[in-house]
């Protein structure tokens, strides 16, 4: 038994959408132009839970015996962030100098924004897996035992979409195998992996693998 029962269930009850549609947020899509398609997992979750819908990934993709959840997340790409914070931007005209109190508040605000985005992602990874395991798979396979499937969670962010300098820095970090707290993708991956890929007993928890992609990398590996 493979993944065919789940594929048939989704095909009978839902229509696929392009990644341009799936990545849209407030009339702006992370994936600008793509004819590749996947299922809308938000729609599937709403079908299962007409009321009190849990949070969910944007898309679900089936490939052989693998299930990919895909989350398109904007908000990480900002002119000022926790890692590029510049105190000079907190200059006060009244005192003609940098306002230390304002600088501290601004840095804390930027840290809170990133923490909130991460918390939202953590909730989606957990509740998406719960919906799949205890509701979607039992619905698709009825009373049958469903196969041992590999479950992946892919996070696509706008971190370097319009910032070639940041993108080049990331490429250089990767080539040099640099691991530090300023490497955005590594910090994100390690955070999610710690919670959902490896339990405290060094055993698989919710996912076989979690990866964080820039838009460019996602387009290269998934859409070509």
Predicted regions and their residues:
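Short, low-complexity, polybasic intrinsically disordered segments
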Residues: 146-219, 223
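Conserved catalytic cores of phosphodiester-cleaving nucleases, focusing on short active-site segments
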Residues: 59-61, 66-74, 128
